[in-house]
Every structure is written in C-alpha cells, then in structure tokens.
Amino acid sequence: MLKTNLKLSKDIKTDDVKTFCKKIDKIIKTLIGHKLITFTVIDNNLKFCERIYSNNSKIYPIFGQKKMPKNIWSEKVLKNKKHFLCKNKKDIKKIYYDYETIFSLGCGSIINLLVLFNKKPIGTINILHKESHYKKIDLKKIDYLTTYLIPYFLDHQKIMERKI
C-alpha cells in the first residue's frame, strides 16, 4: 500500500525539493492518475510563476517562467482562491496558450491545485491526463497535499525575489 500520510519530521527534507516533489507526484499518480504533473511557484506580486518540478522536463523544463494570465483561470485561482478543473480539450483551448503542446502529450483534462499560505496564492500543482479523466471529486482526494508544499514554495519565492 502506498504511504500517503507524510510525516513532516521524517519524510520531508527542505533542502531536497526534487525528491519530495517526486513523492507527491507518486501519491497523486496513485490516487487520481496523470500523464503530466508540474509544480509552479507564484511570485509575491502574482505577476509570474516559475516551475520547480516537472515529470517531463524536456517539454516543461524546471525553472521555466511564464507571466500569469488575465483570464477565467486567474479570476478563479488568483482572485477567488479556488482550485481549477478543466475537463475537456475545448475548454483547455480557450484558457491555455500552450494547448497544442498539452494535446500533443495526449492530455485533455487539467487540475490546477492551488497552494495557499496565509490565504495568499503561492503556487499550483498542475496535473494533466486524457480528456474527461478528471472529475470534481478528484480535487477532494488530493487537495490535502498542498499543505506539505508550503515550505518549499515559500523558500522558492525568496529565490525568485532575488532574481528580480
């Protein structure tokens, strides 16, 4: 059986982000499945984000940056502080500028799991699978995992601040 109850003192090493992210990746893959997963940290001003983990770093490289969009996604995730579920390719095409890359990987549904600290968005876990794979219930199965990422995301925000 997969261990899903992480113990902060034993399982998490704040200096080993990649190993920890791989553990979260494995748990999510077991609980709801995925073809692609990335973790992104949002800067303090909510202007851009930076990828700190990817299970496909050839297509979605680590430390890749992008500006935060101004669309329905940013309204729901950044302003209303809610997780985001996109169930099909039609909706993905409306929202994500890199939809062609997403589709080329065989993905057609997306969960963006919001990571909050003190009620402020600090990052997302981005989980992708085939079209119509994810349902609302899947969010509830995995949203507890976001709390384990908070120390890593806060540390990376400090690194991002030094780059500006």
Outline where the language-model segments fall.
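Sensory-domain boundary capping and coupling elements
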Residues: 116-129
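Regulatory sensory and allosteric helical modules in signal-transduction proteins
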Residues: 58-93
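Signal-transmission linkers at sensory-effector interfaces
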Residues: 1-15
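A short, aliphatic-rich beta-strand micro-motif
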Residues: 109-116
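Short, hydrophobic-rich beta-strand element in sensory/regulatory alpha-beta domains
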Residues: 23-29, 34-43
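GAF sensory/regulatory domain recognition
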Residues: 39-61
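Signal-transducing coupling segments at domain and membrane junctions
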Residues: 90-106
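Juxtadomain coupling helices with adjacent low-complexity linkers
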Residues: 17, 129-164
